[in-house]
Regions:
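Short amphipathic helix-loop junctions that connect adjacent transmembrane helices
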Residues: 12-27, 221-239
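Helix-to-loop junctions at the C-terminal end of transmembrane segments
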Residues: 42-55, 254-267, 351
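Hydrophobic core of transmembrane alpha-helices in multi-pass small-molecule transporters
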Residues: 82-107, 293-307
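C-terminal transmembrane helical hairpin of 12-TM major facilitator-type secondary transporters
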Residues: 267-312
Length: 379
């Protein structure tokens, strides 16, 4: 919940904040894209480490890394707003700070997912992952609301709040979360190392990557779309972007506490339904010229995200052994980050050509992934 709220705070204010310090659209989106690549590379290593040393210390490490990284990232923009840093030097400093943060904060997601898998029976795995997703969704709902309120005190206020929240979560985990036992150390040459090409999970991992290529493309150009179409200033853009993200997160939350807890479908069925909802949402966003219609599109996106990601996590967890839970959780956690590498860059470049091309790009990605999954099921 803490990381979900923190990330939604960043996404809500980064576009207007970047424009305040005269960074271009491609520079702003590339900060997310390149740091996401770092996140993707680091996540599997943290997942495997949690298999050996236990989940709790890795979760705490990730939360503390998020705290320190956010403070450094915020300080860079504070210096930029003061006029001390500008241009390429400011961009490089912000990129370095975000990448450093990504190396350590990537520890939290795989270790948390593996902890949930360790403590749930196979027949309840999809529901358990949905509950974990619900906690993240609650943070994502609250984040934009908090961001909009705090933005009245300045664009940096939400980031300081995110750092405080992550530090509080680390303290809570340290005090309250039961320890998980260390596993016996296996010699390096005998360790089974899961790869993205593993036949048991590769279709699920590819789906997750495609899903977030499309979603991140929309998310990272949303602030530009609102600011340009509604002619907003920086603070207004942060508030409206936060509201749009809150709509998406609200639908994610609702579908995870209702549909996914009541319907007994296979993970693959949930994934296909979710992709169809996201395709509708992206298509609506491509033609949206006022906020109510845009909110409808974001609602469809949130519904799709709520159906797909817990199902991907559950399907991957069920496909591997107990000794591989941390490893597969690390791979699944890396997939959104990989999507955030390509999505913002492609959508940011297309947005500069025409604003509608960004959501159309995302719709095309959702359609392609859906078609490939349907064809795979028919084989």
């Amino acid at each position: 919940m803490a990381t979900g709220m923190g990330q939604s705070l960043v996404f809500a204010i980064l576009a207007p904040l970047g424009r305040e310090v005269a960074l271009g659209e491609l520079q702003i989106t590339s900060i997310i894209a390149i740091s996401a690549l770092v996140f993707a590379l680091a996540s599997p290593h943290w997942g495997r480490l949690s298999d050996r040393v236990g989940r709790k210390p890795i979760i705490i490490t990730g939360l503390l890394g998020y705290t320190v990284g956010t403070l450094v990232f915020t300080s860079v923009f504070s210096i930029g707003l003061a006029g001390v840093l500008s241009g390429t030097l400011l961009y490089a400093a912000a990129l370095l700070a975000r990448c450093g943060q990504s190396v350590v904060m990537s520890a939290t997601n795989p270790s948390t997912t593996a902890y949930a898998a360790d403590n749930s029976a196979a027949e309840h795995r999809t529901r358990t992952m949905a509950r974990l997703g619900t906690a993240n969704s609650m943070g994502t709902i609250l984040g934009p609301a908090v961001s909009g309120a705090l933005a009245t005190f300045g664009l940096l206020a939400p980031l300081y709040f995110a750092a405080t929240l992550a530090a509080s979560a680390a303290l809570l985990v340290w005090r309250q979360l039961p320890k998980t036992p260390r596993r016996e150390r296996v010699p390096r040459h005998l360790r089974i190392r899961l790869r993205f090409t593993d036949r048991r999970v590769r279709h699920l991992l590819a789906t997750a990557v495609g899903l977030f290529v499309g979603f991140s493309g929309i998310q990272q150009t949303l602030g530009f779309t609102l600011q340009d179409k509604l002619e907003l200033n920086g603070i207004q853009t942060a508030q409206m972007t936060g509201a749009a993200l809150m709509v998406s997160a609200l639908f994610t939350f609702l579908v995870q506490i209702t549909v996914m807890q009541r319907l007994k479908l296979e993970p693959g069925q949930f994934i296909r339904l979710g992709l169809l909802a996201m395709l509708f949402g992206a298509t609506i966003l491509a033609s949206a010229d006022h906020f109510p219609l845009l909110a409808v599109g974001m609602g469809f996106l949130g519904t799709g995200l709520g159906l797909t990601m817990p199902s991907i996590s559950a399907g991957a967890s069920l496909a591997v052994s107990a000794d591989e839970q941390g490893s597969v959780a690390g791979l699944v956690a890396a997939c959104p980050a990989i999507g955030f590498v390509a999505g913002p860059l492609c959508a940011g470049a297309l947005y500069q050509v025409h604003p509608s091309l960004a959501p159309l790009f995302s719709a095309s990605v959702f359609f392609l992934v859906l078609v490939l999954l349907v064809l795979r099921e028919r084989r």
